[in-house]
From Swiss-Prot:
Family: Belongs to the UPF0235 family.
Pfam families: DUF167 (PF02594)
Signal peptide: none
Taxonomic superkingdom: Bacteria
SMART domains recorded: DUF167
Any single Gene Ontology cellular-component annotation: cytoplasm
Identification of the protein by name: UPF0235 protein Atu2660
Length: 112
């Protein structure tokens, strides 16, 4: 169930912590291309970023491709993005080491 969420709902995609942000992502591996496909809300009302990568879900290749994609789109080093949960699932929680107050500006780069 895909939705174009208003800006005030985008904050539901991430949680701010003292020195990082936790971002909810739904990854489609073997998706033909590396891209951010917008924001999706599941049946439970939880929002997450939709991403696809061309890499296969074997040996962590799709996860590595996701980190490369997000780092490039956000303008952050790859080392600043790590997995908190979901390394073997489509739905993932990522830790992004960046100033939580600046994250909204960075996040808007993903849509561009």
């Amino acid at each position: 169930m895909e939705h174009a969420l208003p800006d005030d709902c985008l904050s539901g995609l991430w949680r701010k912590h003292d020195d990082h942000v936790r971002l909810s992502v739904r990854l489609t591996p073997n998706g033909g291309r590396d891209a951010i496909d917008g924001v999706e809300q599941d049946a439970d009302g939880n929002a997450h970023l939709k991403a696809r990568v061309s890499a296969v879900p074997e040996g962590g290749k799709a996860n590595k491709a996701l980190i490369v994609l997000l780092a490039k789109k956000l303008g952050l080093p790859k080392s600043s993005i790590t997995f908190i949960s979901g390394e073997t699932a489509r739905k993932k929680i990522l830790r992004i080491d960046t100033d939580p107050e600046d994250f909204e500006k960075l996040f808007k780069k993903l849509a561009g």
